[in-house]
C-alpha cells in the first residue's frame, strides 16, 4: 500500500513511555569528558579543582533540557588544554607600585629576578587554569551548538516526514472518497437495473394476458366457424323445396358463406395477434434473463467496490494515525530544538557571567595602575604648578592652566622614560630587543579590550534570540498597554528615532495640558499649605547646611514657603475682582466642569506613561480635586452616589457579552474558586488582624472580609483595555469577581449583627442564621423575578419599540431596564450591579444586544470614569506621609499575601501557575465594596475612624496600582512562560469553562486576522498551531493560542471541541487542512467547519470530507481586484456590487445559505434582504474611487 511507509525515531536513549528521552546514568565522551546526570558537572581529565568548580558554574545540566538529551552526539571537539600551551610572561616593571610622588621603588637585580620569577609563575599557573576553564566551557558550548544543529536537522526531517504523510493521507482519503462514490454509483446502477427488471416483469404480465386474450379470441373464432360449417351441412341435407322456398334458401346460403369467410378472417387475425403476443412475451423473457444477469454482475461489482471502499476507509484511518504520529514527532522535534536553544542560551549566559568577574578584576588592576600613575603625575603637576605660581607675576600673561597643560607632556615623557628603563635593562640582559618587549606589553594590554568587545557582541547577538518572540509586531491588536523592549530608553548613536524620543515628542505636543496640570498642582499645594496651619511641619525639613569653597550658607525654609510668595500676589489680584455668591445649582455645575476638566487633562497624560491606563488618570484627577487635595469638589457624597452607576453600567455591559450557556460553564470557578478565595483570604487576613495587629474579633472579621474583596470595576476595565477578557486569567478573574459580588451581601448583613451596639449583645449565631436565610429567600425571589420577567417581557417590548423606529425611546427603555433591575436587587439586599448584570445577561439572548450595547456605551464610560475619580478622592496624601511605613507595609502584605493565596487556590482548581499568578495580581488589590463595609463598621462601632482611614488609603492605593500589577503579570508570563514549549501545550483545565467558543486551526496570516476580529468583539476562541514561533507571538499578545496538532482527537478534546460551536481551518498545507477537517467531521460532527481551500478541486474534496462551507483562498483577493478594475472601467458602483455579490453567491452557495439563516453576511457581501437598489448609471456620481484604484462598496 502507498501509506505503508515508515519513519525512524531519533537515535536517543529511551527513558520511559511515550517520547521522553533522557541521559543514562553516565556518558563518557571519547576525549576524556565525563558527564554525570546526578550533579551534571563536567570534569576534565586533568582534574583541576578550579576547572571543576568553574565547570559547575557552567551548569551543563542546562543542556539536559527537561530530561531529554541527545546521547550519541556528545563528544569533545578538542582537548581541554592544548598540548603546546605557552603562557605569556608579563615583563617585570609593568605593574610596579610607586611610593611617593617621584620614587619608583628601587631594588637590586637579584631581588628583582626572584620577584619576577615568583610573580610570573603564579600568573602562569592562573593563566593555565583560566585557559583550561575557558577551553572547557568553549568545548561544552561547541557540543551544545552541535546538538542544536542536529536537532534543527531532525526537525526539518520531521517536518518533511509529516508533510509527506499528510499528503499521502490526503491522496488515500481522496481515493477512498472516489471508491465510495464509485460504489454508490454501482449500487445506483444496480437499483436502476432492478427497476428495469421490475418494468419488464410488469410488461411480461401484460404480454401473458394479451396471449391469453388472443388465444380466447382464436377459440371463439374457430367455434363460430364450426357453427357456420355445421349449419351449411345441415341445409344441404334437406329435400328440394318449392320455387319460393328455393329463393330464400339461396339467400341464406350466401349469408352463411359470407359469415364463413368472415370467421376464417377472424381466425387468421387472432392467430396473427397470438403469434405477436407470444413473440413479445418471449422477447420480454429473454430481456428479463439478460437484465438478471446484468444485475448479478452489477451487484457483484458493487459489492467488490463496497469492500474496496471499506478497506480504503480502514486505510484512511491507518494513514491518519500515521500522519498524526508524524506530526507528534514533529512536535517532539520542535520541543527538542527549543530545549537545545534554552540550554545553549543558559550555557552562554553562565559562561559570560563566569568570565565577567575575571575581566573586571583585570580591569580593576589596570585601573589601579593607571590611578597610581595619575597620582604620580598629579603630584608632579601640583609641584610644577606651585613653582609656576611662585615664579609667575600676579598679572601674568599666561594663565596657570595653560602653563600646566604645556608642562604635563614633559612630565609624562619623563615618567615613561623611568618606566621603560627596567624593560630595557631586563630585555638587554635576556638578550631580547626592547621592541619585542614593548609589543608584548601592548598585546597584553589590548587583550581585555578585545575580550570585552567580543563578549558585548555575543551578548548583543543573543538578545534578539531571546526576545524575538516578544519583539513581534503587536500593533495589529488594539490594546492600550504593552511592554517595551530593552531598547526603550536607549539612545541610538546613529540618530534614529526611539520610543523614548517619541514619548518626549508627545510630551512636547501636550505641553499646554502639562502646564495647566502643573498650575492646578501648584494651586493645590498652595491651598493645602494655607489650610493645614500648624501641620506644615510635615513638609518642613531640618536645617540643612550647604558648604562650598567660596561661602557657607544655611537654608531653613522648606520649598513650600518659597512657593507661597507667588500666590500672595495672585490673591491680591483675585481680591480686586468683584465676587458673586454661588448657589447650589451653580456649585453642582462647577463640580461637573471640574471633573470633566481634570479627566480631560490627566487621562491622556497617564496614557502616555509606559504601562499607564486611563484608570490611573481618573484616580490622579480624583486625588487632586478631591477633599484631601485642592478641595475643589464641594458635594462629594452626591458625586459618589452618581458614580456608583458606573459600576452598574459596567456589569450590565459584561452581561451583554456573556450568555447563559457560557455562564453555566463557569460555575466551577464562580462557586468553587470564588468561594475558596473569599473564605480563605478572609480567614487568613482576619487571623492576622486579630493575633498580629491585636484587633478585636468583630473588627478582624470585617477587615478580613473587606480586604478579601477586589475591585470589579477596576479589574474588568483593565482587562478590557488590555484585551484580556477572554483569556484564561481574565475568565478566572471574572468568575471570582462575580462570586465576590454575591459575598458582599453576606458581609453587609453580618456587620450589624456582630456590632457591640447590637441588641443581641455581640455575635449571635441564631440571629446570623435567621438573617442570612431571610436574605437568601429575598435574593432567590428577586433573581427569579428578574429572569422570568426578562424572558417573557424583554423581547416583545423591544420588538414593539423597534417597530416605532424611535432611537430616544429605545435608549430610554434600556435605561429603564438597567435602573429597574438594579433597584429591585438593591431592595432585596443584593448589590445594584448584580441586578444590572442579570439584565444584561437576559438581553444578550435577544437580537437587540448590539444596539443596546452601543446605546449605553457613553453612559458607561462617563460614569465609570466618575467612579474612579471618587475612589481617588478617598486617598489622603497627608495621611500617607504621616503613616508611610505602616501603609506601605500593609499594602505589601495585602498584595503579596492575596497573590500567594490565589495562586495556591488556582493551582488546586487546575489553572496553570502563570495564569494563577496573573489572576492573583489582578485580585490582590482591594475593592470598592471595602469602602462600604469599613464605613458601615465605623457607624456600628466595630472599628475606629483612624483605622478605617488607614484601610481606605491602603485599598485606594492598591486599586490605583492595579494596571501596573496587570503589566507585571504579563511580564512574568513573557519571561517564564514563553521559553519552554511545554508550557504552550493545551491543558483541559485551561478551557473547561468555555462554551460555544470558536476553534481556529492554524495561527498564520488568516488565523491571526480571524483571532483579531474575535478578540475585538470579546468572542471566546482557542487557536492551535504547530509552529512554536507563532504560538509564542500569540501568547505574548495574551491570546489563547496553544502548541498542538489540530488533527489530533486528544488535542481537540483538550480544547473543548465537543462544546465548540464552530471551527475555522486555516492551515497552510492542503494535506493538513484535509486531515483536520476529517478529524472534526468524524469525532465532532456537530461542530460546523469553515475551511480555507487552496483551489476549487481542493474545496470539492474538503466538502466531501465533511466541511460545512469552503472558501477558496483566491476568491476574495480576485473579487477585490476585479472590483477595482471594474471601477476603473467607469462602471457604476451599484452594478459592481451586484456583479461581485452574484459571483460570490454562486461560488459560496452553502455559506450564503448559512448567512441568510443567521441574518447576516459574515463579511461576504450584501445579504439578499439589504441589496442596494439599482441606480442610474452616472459614472461621475456613482463611482467612488479612492487612491490606488480600490472601490468603496
UniProtKB/Swiss-Prot annotation:
Expressed in shoots and roots. Mainly localized to leaf veins, hypocotyls, mesophylls and guard cells. Accumulates at high levels in small and dividing plastids (at protein level). Disruption phenotype: No visible phenotype. Disrupted K(+)/H(+) efflux antiporter in the kea1 kea2 double mutant. Mutants kea1 kea2 display strong growth retardation along with pale green leaves associated with a delayed formation of chloroplast pigments and electron transport complexes, as well as maturation defects of the plastid ribosomal RNAs and hampered RNA-protein interactions. Double mutant kea1 kea2 exhibits a drastic photosystem II (PSII) quantum yield recovery under moderate salt stress. Impaired rapid hyperosmotic-induced Ca(2+) responses in kea1 kea2. Residues 439-465 have a biased composition (Basic and acidic residues). Residues 50-585, 634-640, 690-698, 755-766, 849-860, 905-912, 970-1193 are stromal. The modification N6-acetyllysine is found at residue 168. Residues 131-355 form a coiled coil. The chain crosses the membrane at residues 586-606, 613-633, 641-661, 669-689, 699-719, 734-754, 767-787, 828-848, 861-881, 884-904, 913-933, 949-969. PROSITE patterns: RCK_N. Acetylated at Lys-168 by the stromal acetyltransferase enzyme NSI. Induction: Up-regulated by low K(+) stress and down-regulated by high K(+). Residues 351-364 have a biased composition (Polar residues). Residues 103-135, 351-372, 421-474, 1165-1184 are annotated as: Disordered. One of its GO terms (biological process) is chloroplast organization. Residues 995-1112 form the RCK N-terminal domain. It catalyses: K(+)(in) + H(+)(out) = K(+)(out) + H(+)(in). One of its GO terms (molecular function) is proton transmembrane transporter activity. It is found in: Plastid, Chloroplast inner membrane. Repressed by sodium ions Na(+). Optimum pH is 5.8. It holds the Pfam family TrkA_N. GO terms for cellular component: chloroplast; chloroplast envelope; chloroplast inner membrane; chloroplast membrane; extracellular region; membrane. Electroneutral K(+)/H(+) efflux antiporter involved in chloroplastic K(+) homeostasis and osmotic adjustment, especially during plastid division and thylakoid membrane formation. Collaboratively with KEA2, adjusts alkaline stromal pH upon light to dark transitions in plastids. Together with KEA2, critical for chloroplast development, including chloroplast RNA-metabolism (e.g. rRNA maturation, polysome loading and RNA-protein interactions) and plastid gene expression (PGE), ion homeostasis, and photosynthesis. The full-length protein being inactive in a heterologous system, the N-terminal region seems to have a regulatory or auto-inhibitory function. This is K(+) efflux antiporter 1, chloroplastic.
Amino acid at each position: 500500500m502507498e501509506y505503508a511507509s515508515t519513519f525512524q525515531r531519533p537515535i536517543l536513549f529511551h527513558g520511559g513511555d511515550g517520547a521522553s528521552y533522557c541521559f543514562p546514568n553516565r556518558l563518557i565522551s571519547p576525549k576524556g569528558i565525563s558527564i554525570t546526570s546526578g550533579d551534571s558537572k563536567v570534569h576534565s581529565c586533568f582534574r583541576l579543582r578550579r576547572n571543576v568548580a568553574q565547570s559547575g558554574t557552567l551548569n551543563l545540566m542546562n543542556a539536559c533540557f527537561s530530561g531529554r538529551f541527545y546521547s550519541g552526539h556528545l563528544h569533545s571537539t578538542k582537548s581541554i588544554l592544548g598540548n603546546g600551551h605557552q603562557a605569556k610572561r608579563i615583563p617585570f616593571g609593568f605593574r610596579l607600585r610607586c611610593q611617593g610622588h617621584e620614587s619608583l621603588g628601587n631594588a637590586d637585580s637579584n631581588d628583582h629576578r626572584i620577584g619576577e620569577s615568583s610573580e610570573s609563575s603564579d600568573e602562569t599557573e592562573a593563566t593555565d587554569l583560566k585557559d583550561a576553564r575557558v577551553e572547557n566551557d568553549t568545548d561544552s558550548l561547541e557540543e551544545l551548538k552541535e546538538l542544536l544543529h542536529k536537532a534543527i536537522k531532525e526537525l526539518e526531517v520531521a517536518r518533511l516526514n509529516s508533510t509527506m504523510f499528510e499528503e499521502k493521507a490526503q491522496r488515500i482519503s481522496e481515493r477512498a472518497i472516489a471508491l465510495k462514490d464509485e460504489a454508490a454509483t454501482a449500487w445506483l446502477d444496480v437499483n436502476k437495473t432492478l427497476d428495469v427488471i421490475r418494468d419488464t416483469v410488469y410488461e411480461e404480465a401484460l404480454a401473458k394476458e394479451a396471449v391469453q386474450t388472443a388465444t380466447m379470441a382464436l377459440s371463439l373464432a374457430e367455434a363460430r366457424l364450426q357453427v357456420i360449417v355445421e349449419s351449411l351441412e345441415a341445409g344441404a341435407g334437406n329435400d328440394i323445396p318449392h320455387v319460393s322456398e328455393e329463393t330464400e334458401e339461396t339467400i341464406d346460403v350466401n349469408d352463411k358463406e359470407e359469415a364463413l369467410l368472415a370467421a376464417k378472417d377472424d381466425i387468421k387475425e387472432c392467430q396473427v395477434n397470438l403469434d405477436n403476443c407470444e413473440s413479445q412475451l418471449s422477447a420480454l423473457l429473454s430481456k428479463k434473463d439478460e437484465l438478471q444477469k446484468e444485475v448479478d454482475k452489477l451487484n457483484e461489482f458493487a459489492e467488490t467496490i463496497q469492500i474496496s471502499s471499506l478497506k480504503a476507509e480502514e486505510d484512511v484511518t491507518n494513514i491518519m494515525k500515521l500522519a498524526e504520529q508524524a506530526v507528534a514527532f514533529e512536535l517532539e522535534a520542535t520541543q527538542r530544538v527549543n530545549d537545545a536553544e534554552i540550554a545553549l542560551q543558559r550555557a552562554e549566559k553562565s559562561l559570560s557571567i563566569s568570565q565577567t568577574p575575571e575581566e573586571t578584576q583585570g580591569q580593576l588592576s589596570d585601573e589601579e595602575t593607571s590611578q597610581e600613575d595619575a597620582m604620580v603625575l598629579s603630584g608632579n603637576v601640583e609641584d610644577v604648578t606651585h613653582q609656576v605660581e611662585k615664579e609667575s607675576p600676579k598679572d601674568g600673561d599666561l594663565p596657570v592652566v595653560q602653563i600646566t597643560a604645556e608642562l604635563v607632556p614633559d612630565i609624562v615623557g619623563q615618567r615613561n622614560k623611568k618606566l621603560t628603563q627596567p624593560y630595557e635593562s631586563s630585555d638587554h640582559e635576556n638578550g631580547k630587543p626592547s621592541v619585542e618587549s614593548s609589543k608584548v606589553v601592548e598585546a597584553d594590554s589590548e587583550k581585555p579590550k578585545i575580550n570585552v568587545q567580543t563578549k558585548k557582541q555575543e551578548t548583543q547577538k543573543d538578545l534578539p534570540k531571546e526576545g524575538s518572540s516578544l519583539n513581534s509586531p503587536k500593533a495589529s491588536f488594539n490594546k492600550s498597554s504593552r511592554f517595551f523592549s530593552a531598547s526603550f530608553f536607549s539612545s541610538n548613536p546613529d540618530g534614529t528615532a526611539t520610543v523614548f524620543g517619541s514619548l518626549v515628542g508627545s510630551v512636547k505636543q501636550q505641553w499646554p495640558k502639562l502646564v495647566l496640570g502643573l498650575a492646578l498642582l501648584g494651586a493645590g499645594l498652595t491651598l493645602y499649605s494655607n489650610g493645614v496651619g500648624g501641620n506644615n511641619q510635615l513638609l518642613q525639613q531640618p536645617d540643612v547646611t550647604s558648604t562650598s569653597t567660596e561661602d557657607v550658607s544655611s537654608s531653613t525654609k522648606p520649598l513650600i514657603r518659597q512657593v507661597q510668595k507667588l500666590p500672595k500676589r495672585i490673591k491680591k489680584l483675585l481680591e480686586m475682582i468683584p465676587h458673586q455668591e454661588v448657589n447650589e445649582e451653580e456649585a453642582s455645575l462647577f463640580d461637573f466642569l471640574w471633573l470633566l476638566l481634570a479627566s480631560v487633562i490627566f487621562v491622556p497624560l497617564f496614557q502616555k506613561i509606559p504601562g499607564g491606563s486611563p484608570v490611573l488618570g481618573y484616580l490622579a484627577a480624583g486625588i487632586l480635586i478631591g477633599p484631601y487635595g485642592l478641595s475643589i469638589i464641594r458635594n462629594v457624597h452626591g458625586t459618589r452616589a452618581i458614580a456608583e452607576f458606573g459600576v452598574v453600567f459596567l456589569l450590565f455591559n459584561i452581561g451583554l457579552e456573556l450568555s447563559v450557556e457560557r455562564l453555566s460553564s463557569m460555575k466551577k470557578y464562580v462557586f468553587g474558586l470564588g468561594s475558596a478565595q473569599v473564605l480563605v483570604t478572609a480567614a487568613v487576613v482576619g487571623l492576622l488582624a486579630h493575633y498580629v495587629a491585636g484587633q478585636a474579633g468583630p473588627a478582624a472579621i470585617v477587615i478580613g472580609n473587606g480586604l478579601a474583596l477586589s475591585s470589579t470595576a477596576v479589574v474588568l476595565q483593565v482587562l478590557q483595555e488590555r484585551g484580556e477578557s477572554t483569556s484564561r486569567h481574565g475568565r478566572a478573574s471574572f468568575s471570582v469577581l462575580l462570586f465576590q459580588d454575591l459575598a458582599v451581601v453576606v458581609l453587609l448583613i453580618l456587620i450589624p449583627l456582630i456590632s457591640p451596639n447590637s441588641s443581641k449583645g455581640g455575635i449571635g449565631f441564631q440571629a446570623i442564621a435567621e438573617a442570612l436565610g431571610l436574605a437568601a429567600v429575598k435574593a432567590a425571589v428577586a433573581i427569579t423575578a428578574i429572569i422570568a420577567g426578562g424572558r417573557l417581557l424583554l423581547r416583545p417590548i423591544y420588538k414593539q419599540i423597534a417597530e416605532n423606529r424611535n432611537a430616544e425611546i429605545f435608549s430610554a427603555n434600556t435605561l429603564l431596564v438597567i435602573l429597574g433591575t438594579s433597584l429591585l436587587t438593591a431592595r432585596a439586599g443584593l448589590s445594584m450591579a448584580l441586578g444590572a448584570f442579570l439584565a444584561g445577561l437576559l438581553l444578550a439572548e435577544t437580537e437587540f444586544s448590539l444596539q443596546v450595547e452601543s446605546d449605553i456605551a457613553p453612559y458607561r464610560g462617563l460614569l465609570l470614569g466618575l467612579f474612579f475619580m471618587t475612589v481617588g478622592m478617598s486617598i489622603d496624601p497627608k495621611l500617607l506621609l504621616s503613616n508611610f511605613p505602616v501603609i506601605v507595609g500593609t499594602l505589601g502584605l495585602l498584595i503579596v499575601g492575596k497573590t500567594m493565596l490565589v495562586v495556591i487556590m488556582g493551582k488546586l482548581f487546575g489553572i496553570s501557575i502563570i495564569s494563577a499568578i496573573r489572576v492573583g495580581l489582578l485580585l490582590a488589590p482591594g475593592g470598592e465594596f471595602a469602602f462600604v463595609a469599613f464605613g458601615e463598621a465605623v457607624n456600628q462601632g466595630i472599628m475606629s475612624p483612624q483605622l478605617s482611614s488607614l484601610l481606605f488609603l491602603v485599598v485606594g492605593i492598591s486599586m490605583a496600582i492595579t494596571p501596573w500589577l496587570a503589566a507585571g503579570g504579563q511580564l512574568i508570563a513573557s519571561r517564564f512562560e514563553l521559553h519552554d514549549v511545554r508550557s504552550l501545550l493545551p491543558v483541559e483545565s485551561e478551557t473547561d469553562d468555555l462554551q460555544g467558543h470558536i476553534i481556529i486551526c492554524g495561527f498564520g496570516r488568516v488565523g491571526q486576522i480571524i483571532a483579531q476580529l474575535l478578540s475585538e468583539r470579546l468572542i471566546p476562541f482557542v487557536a492551535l498551531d504547530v509552529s512554536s514561533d507563532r504560538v509564542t507571538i500569540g501568547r505574548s499578545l495574551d491570546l489563547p493560542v496553544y502548541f498542538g496538532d489540530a488533527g489530533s482527537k486528544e488535542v481537540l478534546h483538550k480544547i473543548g471541541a465537543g462544546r465548540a460551536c464552530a471551527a475555522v481551518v486555516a492551515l497552510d498545507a492542503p494535506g493538513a487542512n484535509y486531515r483536520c477537517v476529517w478529524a472534526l467531521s468524524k469525532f465532532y460532527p456537530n461542530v460546523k467547519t469553515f475551511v480555507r481551500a487552496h483551489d476549487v478541486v481542493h474545496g470539492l474534496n474538503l466538502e466531501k470530507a465533511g466541511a460545512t462551507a469552503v472558501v477558496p483562498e483566491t476568491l476574495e483577493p480576485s473579487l477585490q481586484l476585479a472590483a477595482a478594475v471594474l471601477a476603473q472601467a467607469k462602471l457604476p458602483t451599484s452594478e459592481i456590487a451586484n456583479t461581485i455579490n452574484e459571483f460570490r453567491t454562486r461560488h459560496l452557495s452553502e455559506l450564503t445559505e448559512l448567512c441568510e439563516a443567521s441574518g447576516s453576511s459574515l463579511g461576504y457581501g450584501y445579504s439578499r434582504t439589504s441589496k442596494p437598489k439599482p441606480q442610474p448609471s452616472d459614472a461621475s456620481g456613482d463611482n467612488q474611487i479612492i487612491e490606488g484604484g480600490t472601490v468603496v462598496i
